[in-house]
Design a protein with these regions (language model features):
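Short Gly/Thr/Asp-enriched flexible loops that form oxyanion-binding sites at enzyme active sites
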Residues: 43-62, 199-205
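Structural motif
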Residues: 36-37, 188
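Short beta-strand segments
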Residues: 40-42, 66-69, 100-105, 168, ...
Length: 205
């Protein structure tokens, strides 16, 4: 196969914000009909956020769009970058459309990937659904029934409202925080509640 390399951003992933999501999404969408697959290398700190946002900004892609990175730089003797790239290329050659994250022998839907470990090579987990693919000595094994497929046209939507706050509840969360957020004129509050959505209603209610 032929490879084409394009530099989009040179930025520590801790600084990837909604403005950069827009740059990345536009770059992908412009070339989406020119290639059989697109692989994006990305720092691991915010890669799951970017993969998820691109999943919503570019809907119904007909080609694989895969994010990957590494815990150690590619020049390090113990780097995980090479195998992660191999996993990404294996997914790229599958021809299955969608946005994915390839890391430590797992292929995860972009909307399901979360970084849960800071230094381990097994840094990402697939939340509330199994990984859609595994790379091992047998090659790439996909569970295609877990990958959403649509006959709809590929669409691009870059209307991002970044004035939304995520509030993670703890048993000691002070409800006055909500008033502060309203005064700050946030346009949306997402409450990460307990379990399946429980919120305290005694004292701190």
């Amino acid at each position: 196969f032929e490879l084409y390399v394009k530099e989009i951003l040179l930025l520590d992933s801790s600084n990837i914000q909604p403005e950069e999501w827009n740059v990345i999404a536009k770059a992908i969408y412009i070339d989406i009909n020119n290639y059989d697959a697109i692989i994006i290398t990305h720092g691991t700190d915010t890669m799951a956020y970017t993969a998820s946002m691109i999943s919503f900004m570019i809907q119904n892609p007909k080609i694989p769009i895969i994010f990957t990175g590494s815990q150690l730089p590619i020049g390090n003797f113990l780097t995980d970058a090479i195998f992660n790239l191999r996993s990404a290329f294996a997914m790229a050659m599958s021809g299955v459309g969608g946005v994915f994250l390839a890391f430590d022998r797992q292929i995860i839907l972009g909307t399901r990937a979360v970084k849960v470990r800071t230094t381990s090579f097994h840094a990402f987990e697939s939340i509330n659904t199994p990984p859609v693919g595994i790379v091992d000595s047998h090659g790439l094994t996909l569970q295609k029934n877990l990958i959403p497929q649509h006959d709809l046209d590929t669409t691009f939507n870059n209307k991002i409202n970044s004035n939304v706050f995520l509030l993670k509840l703890t048993p000691a969360t002070n409800p006055a925080i909500i008033d502060l957020l309203i005064k700050a004129k946030v346009q949306g509050i997402v409450i990460e509640a307990f379990g399946a959505g429980g919120i305290q209603f005694v004292r701190r209610d």
